[in-house]
């Protein structure tokens, strides 16, 4: 592969064995970037360093990280809402604020963003963000729009090698061991993968995952060690070790 791409990669098939694998590799001397984000423009100035952007929910193509909240076993939200979305200025992410007021009240702390969104397809998602001393329409501002950047749609895509990429900026969900684990890059419960010499960064929750078979016991551990052990036992019973 050469150059940069903003699109996620979904491998359609796997290799036949460890000696007959499919390899995804960046071309020698090329910097190939795969992102889960898109550049956004059209920011409107609100006050001081605060800017606002409104987008139709259709922009997100069925998955809206600013309506998607982080939750699951072993996650403590500390009394606030966390989203899988993110806002990036020149490649670096801002911090999600606890409320619109937290963004409107400028401070010397890390720049914040905040979003409001409804679930309807015809609705609007509005983002507010602090860009200290910067016009976001003259800089590169990106937002998360995809849950992963390299992840099979189905399990059993075996014997892949992924090498030499920059993979970044994905709206990954919380990944407890008791639920399906979707990473910025992940095998989706497939075997024989080699992931090497890649830069993996700016993932909301997790970078690399093995995955998990989905079943009726997802997120039902009640935060117990026994729940974790039973997750492993069920995987072995389903033939993972064969």
Region annotations inferred by a language model:
Residues 1-189, 194, 199-201, 207-210, ...:
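Extracellular polysaccharide-degrading/modifying enzymes targeting complex plant/algal/animal polysaccharides
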């Amino acid at each position: 592969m050469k150059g940069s791409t903003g699109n996620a990669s979904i491998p359609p098939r796997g290799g036949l064995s460890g000696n007959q694998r499919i390899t995804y590799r960046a071309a020698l001397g090329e910097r190939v970037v795969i992102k889960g984000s898109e550049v956004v423009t059209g920011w409107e100035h609100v006050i001081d360093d605060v800017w606002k952007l409104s987008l139709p929910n259709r922009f997100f193509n069925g998955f809206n990280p600013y309506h998607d909240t982080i939750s699951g076993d072993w996650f403590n939200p500390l009394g606030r809402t966390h989203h899988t979305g993110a806002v990036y200025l020149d490649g670096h992410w801002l911090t999600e604020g606890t409320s619109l007021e937290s963004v409107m009240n400028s401070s010397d702390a890390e720049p914040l963003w905040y979003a409001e969104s409804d679930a309807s397809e015809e609705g609007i998602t509005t983002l507010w963000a602090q860009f200290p001393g910067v016009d976001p329409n003259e800089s590169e501002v990106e937002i998360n729009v995809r849950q992963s950047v390299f992840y099979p749609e189905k399990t059993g895509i075996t014997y892949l090698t992924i090498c030499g990429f920059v993979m970044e900026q994905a709206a990954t969900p919380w990944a407890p061991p008791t639920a399906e684990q979707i990473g910025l890059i992940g095998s989706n419960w497939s075997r024989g993968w080699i992931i090497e010499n890649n830069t993996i960064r700016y993932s909301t929750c997790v970078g690399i995952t093995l995955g998990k078979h989905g079943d009726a016991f997802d997120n039902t551990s009640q935060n117990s060690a026994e729940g974790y052990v039973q997750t492993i036992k069920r995987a072995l019973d389903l033939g993972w070790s064969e």
